[in-house]
Amino acid sequence: KATEQIKFCSPISGKVKAVMRGERRRILRVEVESDGKMQRVQLVKAGFQPATREEALQLLLNSGLFAFFRQRPYDVVACPIDMPKAVFVSTFSKMPLAADFSFIVKGQEADFKSGIALLEKLAKVYVGISPEQINTPILPLDSAQVSVFSGPNPAGNVGVHINRVSPVNKGEIVWTVGPEVVVMMGRLLRQGMVDFT
């Protein structure tokens, strides 16, 4: 509520059915009743490439994808007014039963790469990968510094990557975003509309 530019977009088209609030009127859940049409809004023309940081930021805000960005320290929703020192993306998790990102991104590697290029418009981009991902189609990434992390959990934790690669000093902030959101950002550039599938 402090930053009105951030939009939270529904993955389906329809009407808001209910808004569930918790303590201090915090929004816990918004229920949307589908109209069965799955209409999407064309935000930009397909193949759009933002030229400036402002264009890239405005596209992410209008699409609702900026709501997925987290700010460190404190792990809160990022503020678009702030200038981060860097953006971090961890492409793996060592937690038990964690999904394999290489499987998730299969066939969407080009979207992942163009999403990383979009992030590069915002700040320096650091991508953490596991040794198993070195010879996969997600590499090379020309727009990011790639670091390899191995070992047990929490090796895939983005906080570990921040601490090892570019620690946050007093007065600095960094943004983090999940790799599945980076794929959605690349898909947004390719199609010109948000696709949460």
Locate predicted features.
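Generic structural motif
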Residues: 3, 8-18
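Buried, small/hydrophobic-residue-enriched core segments of structured protein domains
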Residues: 6, 20-197
